Amino acid sequence: MEVRASRGRIVRLVYVGACLLVLLHCWVSPAVGGACPKPTDEIETDRPDITNSSRVVPQGSLQFENGVNFTTPEKSNVLDGTNTRARLGIAACLEVLVDVPTYFATLSGPAVSGFTNVAPAVKWQISPIPGTIDLSAVAGIGLPTGSQALVGPGPQPYVQFPWSWELTAAWSVNGMLTAFFHPSDPVSKQVYESTLVLERKLSEKAGVFIEWIGDFPSAATARHLLNSGAIYRLSKTEQIDFHIGAGLNGEAPSFVIGLGYSYRFDRLF
């Protein structure tokens, strides 16, 4: 009974948090709406780095981000796809998003195969003024639709804060703080994740990055990963990307490589 009550409290807390994001957005959006992303802006995605963009998609735009990865966790070889995230700008500086279930196929080794959870969320871009530290707040939940052996039991709420700081016209520093809650897991109830990215803009269409990711489970050893990659915009609404990474300790995958393609439809409403 205590586990169910705790699970219900966390789910309700994330639900209330998502509602608060919407209410706060409605309160402050008239003052900052002019600085929010517009359909004339170039596409910005939450990939290929783990760190998500601090900017939302423009109001009335629908963006799909997709990719495939090859990783080597637990002395296994695993291929996963399509890592699809759908993002819809429902108001100025406000979007709803959903992570579509991704399939992990174990090619060799003891790693588990299966689908991940479907995970809806709300994202509010708090500080959209260029030249400052941009910050967004995200509240979401992984619904128990995937393979329990792969992702764990029960609903899995999370809160997240992506941020970015433009140092110069070419250099920027980005990061993200995330708290994942696993109320139905009998061992590890929370996982905290921190990321830090150094990004270099090569041109109006291309950029490269290097990233550190740290995962800190409440009842397990931390995992550290070094990730790097590049993006190239085929147009204002299309992007291809590439990333390659390596684990910094034994708990992280020893190797990861991936490719992605993203596109955006504008002025849908």
Listing of model-derived features with the role each one plays in the protein:
Residues 1-41, 268-269:
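Cleavable N-terminal export/targeting peptides
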Residues 32-269:
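Transmembrane beta-barrel domains of Gram-negative outer membranes and organellar outer membranes
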